[in-house]
Amino acid sequence: MKFDGVILYGPPASGKDTVTAELCKLSSAYAYFEKLKAGEGRTTGYRMVTEESLADLRQRGLIVHEVARYGATYAVDSLGLNKLFEQGRIPIVHMGQVAGVEFLRRHNARWLDVLLWCSKDVTEKRARQRGSSDVKERLAVWDATLADLGTLAEPQFTMSIRTDVLGPSTVAVLIHSAMARK
């Protein structure tokens, strides 16, 4: 099967950003999908919008999935995804909830869904190394991600990769190889 996009699912600090950067080094066709974000916190890597703009998109049926976390609302919008597809790009979408993966699968594309996983200890270490000020909250989200996976009746991911065992460049090569298969 040929895939149109990549979903990277996993707990905080499981390597989604690092693996995305490595994929983009492998091919200029890959493009990190910047989610819409309304609220406080980090702005890099997001398309910042107001709550009113988000409500308008929601009302018009243009939000594929959204979640409230870390004092903000994050959303995947069909306009942003379609723009990347129209440009011939391969979107890489980061997800932290199984429901988001399922909603994205319903969008008009074939997705390579990848579970990136690392231990809770590694999540804590990585979060501290990158200077996260909300490490306790991120560890709680790690627990929530594990619980979220426990709700699945059967495995849902095409690939599952331990990022505390394999380095980011190796992980990217594995994903890129799967994308290249027809």
Predicted regions and their residues:
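Hydrophobic anchor at the beta1->P-loop junction of P-loop NTPases
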Residues: 8
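P-loop (Walker A) phosphate-binding loop of NTP-binding proteins
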Residues: 11
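Walker A/P-loop
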Residues: 16-17
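Post-Walker A helix-loop "phosphate-sensing" segment adjacent to the P-loop in P-loop NTPases
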Residues: 25-34
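ATP-dependent small-molecule kinase phosphotransfer cores
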Residues: 37-91, 96-97
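Conserved phosphate-donor/acceptor-positioning beta-strand/loop module used by diverse small-molecule
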Residues: 92-96, 106-128
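Small-molecule kinase domains that catalyze NTP-dependent phosphoryl transfer to phosphate-bearing small molecules
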Residues: 101, 129-174, 178-181
